[in-house]
């Protein structure tokens, strides 16, 4: 299902949840806002852990919140990071489980929410593993 959505609202939701990020070790805070097929926005932030491998990225936090609420189709993702950092490989693969290659990923800089870089999942993860 594809509906129109307000990109500024999606970015603002990501900026708001970024404030809740627990980035004690890296100080690199990320907020994610995932737009479900029904128009609901699910937010997530990164949560670091002293055992670094247990850190949860903002994107996966948003996806798991959405799935836990019964949503499995998504329209778009907005991220707010310090310097428009792209999703890590693990997050790209998790998104590929639910989203096609044309799924839009919008990344805004925390200092300027109007500075948005848009890519598709397929551009960021060509030849994604799909079982």
What do these predicted ranges mean?
Residues 46-60:
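Compact, glycine-rich, soluble single-domain proteins
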